[in-house]
Swiss-Prot record:
GO terms for cellular component: glycerol-3-phosphate dehydrogenase (FAD) complex. NCBIfam families: glycerol3P_GlpB, PRK05329.1-2, PRK05329.1-3. Belongs to the anaerobic G-3-P dehydrogenase subunit B family. It comes from the Bacteria. SUPFAM superfamilies: FAD/NAD(P)-binding domain. Composed of a catalytic GlpA/B dimer and of membrane bound GlpC. This is Anaerobic glycerol-3-phosphate dehydrogenase subunit B. The lineage of its organism: Bacteria, Pseudomonadati, Pseudomonadota, Gammaproteobacteria, Vibrionales. The gene is glpB. GO terms for molecular function: glycerol-3-phosphate dehydrogenase (quinone) activity. It comes from Aliivibrio fischeri (strain MJ11) (Vibrio fischeri). It is an enzyme of class 1 (oxidoreductase).
């Protein structure tokens, strides 16, 4: 099979890149080995919560503008403020078009979202039913918060969240109560209702009668004007519609919080992007992974100094049948997604054997204090790339292989709260670089073209 672009990885970076390529009319394929880290995510878009030195950030874009001078190795420094802003605006508009509106504060500042443990976490964009608390919590206008869960549901504990919220001094005037709700639908299922996860509950609540029962139960514990916090138990597609329906029935203000995995807020993003990709005519190769690639020298007369070119790749499911493309993007993630692996004394990129920006001493990979405020150095290690995010192998630049997302070096998404922002921005940048080179003459006019899907 031949494509204009093949993206290896089906997470935030890979799907962002794929959607932008399709918009420009490129014949695009995504190879996704399985569930991405979005199944474990909050569903909000973190652009920058802290600087690499650990200083809290209130205005991400203003702060990113200083990175070229203060943190020159950071992906944001390479991308620049203008590209990051363009990428995030594009992503917000794209997600709104495909049914998942994302909003931010009008003043350009981060906002706080509530975590399932009752902490406040800084983020940039959130989904419609994620309540946005101001960065200055003393300006919070909510007077009463009601934390409600489904009886027996293990992945959100209101009492624990309540105890932690009461530790936040700026919220000392906030009245916080908790409640458990039982559904009669539990009587009709074969399993113990304590075994149900968020996806199971979303299936039960797809029935209107069960939603009406839930709405009535919520009204017994809250009044209009209260902020009613519930676990994210409404899935993709109709999930947001169901939440609007319950708000209209109850006149309550609902706030979703992500649960322990699987997180339906994160899954909502992934499934919406994948569905849009297929609807636009993309080819999704699910449940497959790349095992190797074939390279050639760009300048065969001087191989020692020549750049490389990736000609084709081989996957586990397609065996000896290669996939070819003019351009490739590697967005396989970091250690969590097995985009990077580590052995006793070194780190490797397992598909192409790309060069890694890492310390030679294993003792430099980690902090001696496990809960160090500066996190662990290995989280900032990743692929060596050019300033245009082209991969490097054995010191040779690979002209047509770009890297995006968590596989990049020079930043710590956990410490900084920058994972989604870097993923979207670097994926968008890779797509823009590819589009500029290929400049297709023919654009897809029919958005209803169905994709070829290899299972």
């Amino acid at each position: 099979m031949n494509f204009d672009t093949i993206i290896i990885g089906g997470g935030m970076a890979g799907l962002s890149c794929a959607l932008r390529c399709l918009e420009a009319g490129l014949k695009t394929a995504v190879i996704a080995s399985g569930q991405s880290a979005l199944h474990f995510s909050s569903g909000s878009i973190d652009v920058l919560a802290k600087t690499p030195s650990g200083e809290p950030v209130s205005n991400p874009m203003t702060c990113i503008d200083t990175f070229a001078k203060e943190y020159p190795n950071h992906p944001y420094a390479t991308l620049g403020k203008e590209t990051v802003e363009r990428a995030i605006d594009w992503y917000r508009n794209t997600l709104s078009t495909i049914g998942v509106p994302l909003t931010s504060q009008n003043n350009g500042l981060n906002h706080y979202r509530l975590t399932p443990l009752g902490a406040m976490k800084s983020t940039w964009l959130s989904q419609p039913f994620v309540h946005q608390f101001p960065m200055d919590l003393e300006k919070n206008k909510t007077q009463k918060m009601v934390l409600i869960t489904i009886d027996g549901f293990r992945d959100f504990q209101p009492k624990l969240a309540q105890d932690n919220l009461k530790q936040i001094t700026q919220l000392s005037d906030l009245e916080i109560t908790t409640a458990n709700i039982s559904l009669s639908a539990f009587n009709d299922i074969q399993r113990n209702h304590c075994e149900l996860r968020s996806i199971d509950l979303s299936r039960l609540l797809s029935k209107r009668a069960n939603r009406q029962e839930l709405a009535y139960a919520l009204q017994q514990h809250a009044q209009p004007g209260d902020l009613v916090v519930i676990p994210s138990i409404f899935g993709n597609g109709t999930g947001l519609t169901y939440l609007k329906e319950i708000e209209q029935l109850t006149k309550l203000t609902l706030c979703e919080v992500p649960t322990m995995p699987p997180s339906l807020l994160g899954i909502r993003l992934e499934e919406s992007m994948k569905h849009a990709f297929i609807e636009l005519g993309g080819t999704m190769l699910n449940g497959d992974h790349v095992v190797q690639g074939e390279f050639s020298y760009v300048d065969k007369s001087d191989p020692e100094h020549s750049h490389y070119r990736l000609n084709r790749i081989f996957t586990k499911n397609h065996g000896d049948f290669p996939l070819q493309a003019k351009q490739f993007v590697l967005a396989t993630g970091s250690f969590f997604s097995q985009g990077l692996k580590a052995n006793v004394d070194s780190m490797i990129e397992p598909i192409f054997g790309l060069d890694i920006a890492q310390s030679d001493k294993r003792t430099d990979w980690y902090s001696h204090d496990f809960f160090s405020t500066q996190s662990h150095p290995f989280l900032s290690m990743g692929i060596k790339t050019t300033a245009n995010f082209q991969a490097i192998k054995s010191g040779h630049v690979i002209d047509n292989l770009y890297c995006a997302g968590a596989i990049l070096s020079g930043y710590n998404p956990i410490l900084e709260g920058s994972g989604s922002g870097v993923a979207i921005s670097s994926g968008f940048h890779a797509a823009e670089s590819i589009i500029e080179q290929l400049q297709p003459n023919d654009f897809f006019q029919n958005n209803n073209i169905k994709a070829e899907v290899a299972l």
